[in-house]
A protein has these predicted regions:
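Positively charged n-region of N-terminal signal peptides that target proteins for export
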Residues: 1-4
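Bacterial N-terminal signal peptides
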Residues: 6-14
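Cys-dependent protein tyrosine phosphatase-like superfamily
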Residues: 18-185, 197-291
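Ser/Thr-glycine-rich phosphate-binding loops at phosphate-binding pockets of nucleotides
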Residues: 190, 194-195
Length: 291
């Protein structure tokens, strides 16, 4: 069995030497975005990012990997520091059952099961855990369907009709929440693909440019590269699986954004036409989460 995740403290120590990316002259550093959870990987916030002449309020918009390993101290932190009021879980049902979230305090849990099938139908992985899924994908890395996932992953997430419906539900529910009542947290298995696309959409709705959206996505690569480098691969096809499904692939993500621009003109048009996020909704989100 592949061991997907090395201890979080080890990952954090490896990140000390990561070079900061710069957006509009401002450094975007992973260590500045991390929220200090010991039992959840890639746990960070959108707070502090500059959006035009404003910035995203700190401590209100959190993105993480699965919460199944939260410690007691993590739960206390999420309750007392962030007052998390709602958790959105983008994992499939089998994934969620295999590794149920630890729900901090009285936070509301909302399943947002998202398909990777690309066929317009909701589906759940039958692998159970993320580790089992990756092991199976490595064993069949040369299969055309696996390679298609590695080359079209973000395109599938953004353009699959059932995925769009899930994100529509996410934004619809998000609009009902008052940030004065606490933070919202969304996650998938590793907090980089399904959750990463949610973050990209939310950043765009808040007025972020493509450069910031790409920089935020790339922080997942900075986080997971030390883990991916420890997994042995024997073929180029397996390396492709690791680089995309264990780490993150900004180049592939950028191609999906290119397709959005080509087909819809902009991410904002995509949000309105495909996700149902109207300009009025965007204005409300900006009033709530920018300062």
């Amino acid at each position: 069995m592949i061991r997907l995740l090395i201890p979080i403290v080890s990952v954090v120590l490896m990140l000390v030497s990561c070079r900061a990316k710069t957006v509009d002259g401002m450094p975007i550093e992973l260590k500045e975005q991390l929220i200090g959870l010991s039992g959840a990987h890639n746990a960070r916030q959108l707070g502090g990012y500059r959006v035009g002449d404003k910035k995203i309020k700190s401590g209100l918009l959190l993105r993480t990997a699965t919460l199944s390993g939260l410690s007691r101290e993590d739960s206390i932190l999420l309750c007392e520091k962030y007052n998390v009021q709602c958790i959105y879980d983008f994992r499939g049902k089998d994934e969620s059952l295999s590794a149920p979230d630890v729900i901090p305090g009285k936070a509301r849990y909302q399943s947002m099961a998202l398909s990777f099938t690309g066929d317009g139908k909701r589906a759940d992985t039958k692998f159970g855990s993320q580790a089992q899924m990756i092991e199976a994908l490595l064993q069949h890395a040369d299969h055309p369907s696996v390679q298609a996932m590695c080359t079209r992953l973000y395109e599938i997430i953004f353009f699959d009709k059932s995925s769009q419906q899930v994100y529509r539900e996410f934004f619809t529910d998000l609009m009902t929440l008052n940030p004065e009542n606490g933070a919202v947290l969304w996650h998938c298995a590793q907090g980089k693909d399904r959750a990463g696309c949610a973050s990209a959409m939310l950043l765009a709705a808040l007025g972020a440019n493509r450069e910031l959206i790409m920089a935020d996505f790339a922080l997942s690569k900075s986080y997971y590269d030390p883990i991916a480098s420890r997994i042995k691969t024997d073929t180029d096809a397996q390396k492709n699986v690791i680089n995309t499904l264990i780490s993150a692939n900004p180049e592939l993500f950028g191609k999906a954004l290119d397709k959005i621009d080509a087909e819809y003109g902009s991410m904002l048009n995509y949000l309105t036409e495909c996700i149902g996020v109207t300009p009025e909704m965007m204005n409300i989100l900006r009033e709530r989460y920018l300062e």
